[in-house]
Amino acid sequence: MAQAAREILQATITEWMKFAAERDKMRKIANDVAMVTRTIIKDHLTFFKTKQIDVECENSEDLKVLGTKISVDPIVEETFPTVKASVALKCGGASRFIIINVNATISAGGPPFMFEELKKGVPETFINNAAEFVRDAFLNVARTGGVTTK
């Protein structure tokens, strides 16, 4: 194989490896952010439950408000050479997105913060954003019975 051809192919492989590493990193971050978010929402629903509101929050994977499922899903869009990540929060017409930027900062209703900061302790703005989502989900389900309009 000619040296020039080898260099072309090696550059392609290097670019792919960089993309694959970024994709794996963003998948991990998105999954971790979703897990933290589910735990926070579970805590908020537990508070609702103490006030006799119809919620299900026995575990972080099965969350419901007034019988309507709350979904917290990591989303990773992988279109070579770009990787975008977010976490989608949805319930009965209410939705929010937590954006994970390429530099591992997280935007979730307030000033962006580093993912490493989330691992040390959850910022108050992140907790408040989750509370606003739970409120919106509750109010939307209460108004519509959980039926979303298109």
Which residues does each predicted region cover?
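Short, intrinsically disordered, low-complexity terminal segments
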Residues: A2, T82-A85, C91, I127-N128, ...
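Contiguous, amphipathic alpha-helical segments that mediate oligomerization or scaffolding
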Residues: A2-E58
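Intrinsically disordered, low-complexity regions
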Residues: A5-R6, Q10, S60, G67, ...
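Residue-identity detector for threonine
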Residues: T12-T14, T37-T39, T46, T50, ...
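Low-complexity, compositionally biased segments
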Residues: R27, M35, F47, C57, ...
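Extended low-polarity, hydrophobic cluster-rich segments
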Residues: V33-I40, V87-C91, I100-V102, V134, ...
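Amphipathic, interaction-prone secondary-structure segments
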Residues: I40, H44-I99
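Ampiphathic alpha-helical segments that act as solvent-exposed interaction surfaces
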Residues: S95-K150
